């Protein structure tokens, strides 16, 4: 098993990132700036993992064991050395071993998390269709409050990719997102998300609703 492990720099954060999703990281600690420079020099990505205990700043945090490997999309370095780093989630991994001594930042020996194959059945089609309709209605309802008409919500055709994209912008606790990330059954993930989407749709009808983050969904929408 050890022969199949991949060495990966790890970035523990108070957030859960899914495959296919993008996030902008504000990097200011020396150890993580060094990590980003290392990744750029050797054209490699790193892993984002949710913090189980500890904090983002200071001593090394204790992370959950399942995270998402990301590739660096762009880096902006400021005069004071701080960085804005845009990354794209690509695949999940599970940490088998961790090393917090050889580098200033945490390094993991990781293996892939394998998703179960999705069976092409009427139930699958129905769940995927319901998810698409709910997401379309949810986003359109939210943006209509700002007099913005959405021509189209562009979501992945693949059921697994769809489940990850939707899970990323759900407004739920990190521990719930971590559970969805660790789930290896696409239909189970979608089934668990549908009642959450239903609740989001009800909340979105309220005037004070502001929970949807436009930055998380803007790459999937086409304004009129």
Where on the chain are the PLM-derived regions?
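N-terminal low-complexity, acidic/polar interaction/targeting segments
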Residues: 1-224
